[in-house]
From Swiss-Prot:
CDD domains: PRAI. It comes from the Bacteria. Pathway: Amino-acid biosynthesis; L-tryptophan biosynthesis; L-tryptophan from chorismate: step 3/5. Its EC number is 5.3.1.24. This is N-(5'-phosphoribosyl)anthranilate isomerase. The keyword Isomerase applies. Pfam families: PRAI. SUPFAM superfamilies: Ribulose-phoshate binding barrel. It catalyses: N-(5-phospho-beta-D-ribosyl)anthranilate = 1-(2-carboxyphenylamino)-1-deoxy-D-ribulose 5-phosphate. Keywords: Amino-acid biosynthesis, Aromatic amino acid biosynthesis, Isomerase, Tryptophan biosynthesis. Belongs to the TrpF family. GO terms for molecular function: phosphoribosylanthranilate isomerase activity.
Length: 218
């Protein structure tokens, strides 16, 4: 199988950024919303100025943020992607699209109507992140959903020509099971952390197991 796009999210220190910058990830994510991994835009701008991230795109994660403020943050910090985890409507995203050149991804919870929701946002976004549905949480659940549904989401994203990332409960011990469903993208945060910090050891282990599966599948 083709190597999935890999996104490491929840970077919340300069050291986190340096560790993940040395990884094989394609995307690195910063959370600009209430979270234990929340970061200040000024810090992100400074960290990015001090760290080379060759071949990696930078993602800003937002929850119900003002559209103008989002566009301002990503431009100032030099980010490439806006990832929306709130109650944004299609009309909101259409407006945001007119304010930025960044890609826009919409995070959606796994559920019975997820494919329908994907179709409703398709005209205005560039990708989807599908995560577990956990009451009171906006992503970053650390809990997996039934990955038997992943092929449905892959089909829906391919029909619309959009990126797709699967999130929730992905770590070195579970990645082989997820890869059996051939996801085009994988998004994780806590699965590569030890004591709240990004772990070079866990990143290396996850990537080793991912590439082993990709090689065997081919």
């Amino acid at each position: 199988m083709k190597k999935p796009s890999l996104k490491y999210c929840g970077i919340h220190s300069l050291e986190d950024l340096k560790v993940t910058a040395r990884s094989k990830a394609d995307y690195l994510g910063f959370i600009f919303a209430e979270s234990k991994r929340s970061v200040d835009p000024a810090d992100v701008k400074r960290w990015c100025g001090e760290t080379d991230t060759p071949g990696k795109k930078l993602v800003g994660v937002f929850v119900n943020e003002n559209m103008s403020r989002m566009a301002e943050i990503v431009k100032d910090a030099g980010l490439d992607v806006i990832q929306l985890h709130g109650d944004e409507t299609a009309a909101d995203i259409k407006r945001l699209k007119s304010m930025t050149d960044c890609e826009i991804w919409k995070a959606l919870p796994h559920g019975n109507d997820t494919v329908q929701s994907m179709a409703s946002f398709a005209p205005y976004i560039d990708g989807y992140v599908i995560d577990s549905s956990v009451k009171g949480m906006r992503g970053g659940t650390g809990v997996s959903f039934s990955w038997d549904s992943v092929p449905l989401y892959i089909d829906a994203a391919q029909r619309e020509g959009k990126r797709l990332f699967i999130a929730g409960g992905v770590n070195p011990d579970t990645i082989a099971d997820l890869l059996k469903r051939r996801p085009p993208g994988i998004d994780l945060a806590s699965g590569i952390e030890e004591r709240g910090r990004k772990s070079e050891k866990l990143i290396s282990l996850l990537e080793e197991r991912m590439f082993e599966h990709v090689f065997i599948s081919e």
